[in-house]
Amino acid sequence: MSEQTINQTKTNTVQKILFWTMLASIITFVAGLIIYTCSYWGHMFSDFAETLSYCIVKNPYTGEYGNIHSIYPPFAFLPFYLFALICKPALTQYIDGTITLEQLAKTPSFIISFLLFYAICMAIVLLLSAKMSKFKGKKLVYLLVSIFCFAPFAFCLFRGNNIIFACILVMLFFMMYNSEKRWQRELANVCLAGAAAVKIYPALLLIFFIKDRRFLDLLKTLLYSVILIFLPFLLIKGGFANIKEIWNNFTHFNGGEGRDASWNNIGFDGLASKIATLLHLPVLHSILSKLFRFGSIIVTIVALCLSHNSKQKMQPVLITLLTYELFQGVSYAYTLVFLIIPIIIYLVNFEEYSKLNKIYYGTCFAVIALPVMAGLNFFLFAQLSAVCLLVKGYIDLFKEYSTLKKEKKLETPQTNEQTEDKAETIESAEQQN
């Protein structure tokens, strides 16, 4: 069989997988949209309305404007200012309590603002996905439709959460991180800093600089992050005094009653809460939460540092993103939208994986991707799949490191023997002369 025929067979396999994925995604997406619209209409676009509200008040941190207590630094919502202007009169009524969220969601100006924002963001995500995958023809179409229907994306759409902005920045970071062009690598640093300024936890991706011994890039990205996080406070009434307010709002939000037990909270804290409730041992909640969260941080750092010379392309990205997503005290399911990146890597390098890894990773990704779960607002299976993916990523990286270490030990005696043989040959030649 010729090499061209083999490559064609590999392409057809991925194309078939994407076709059936797309078909299942479309059907379950429509079902999920109908269910969510009927069951949670009063909460539709709640996050988007909240983000836009931050843009039109003088201070979104102190609570002086109704129930507005932002947990995000200004950079996270300032890019939404133009979208807020489109529906400013309706937003003002919403903030004053004149109209409800449900009424706001029916306002034409708000709908236009939302559709415009999501059309732009979705177009960018799909364009970046196409560039990352380098797929063409039917395969590209199947991929893009599947991404559009991806459950975390659907949930993000239903809520109108601004995490899509952070997702775009992280995608740009990974696209340009290893670029041969210096300006692109520098832009990657800025993108990561921007992602950290939107949702602070992407700062965990700084570990990649440590893994690859790129300490100058690490320092520059930290500097960019500080600038993007703190400098925009000067544009807000109260300036840097709001830093204390944002911290109080953040701790209050994470400690909100019932958030840890929510079925759409996919974080380790939520998992610990469910285990403690199941065993009727409330004391276990805090212990397990700290063990899972900080244990994952330590293991991820060790795994990444040991994978400096790794040939694995997906696993380092996967475990870092999952650690970021699962570590958060309150981590709603839309945070899994970042898995678009490792899923694309998985599909691009599909034939390089063993049969076990193809099935294992594919099954876990499929469970997370099922859009109907977004409609049901139920992500327990996605949560368990995310944990399974994290554990498998650890196993693959540590296993590879162990194998490489053994191979290196086996090569060392051979090298010594070759050196000794060479020395004997030289000595023999000198005696003959």
Per-region residue spans from a language model:
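Primarily membrane-embedded glycan-assembly and transfer machineries that use lipid-linked glycans
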Residues: 2-180, 184-186, 215-334, 340, ...
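Membrane-interface alpha helices of multi-pass inner-membrane proteins
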Residues: 185-209, 320-327
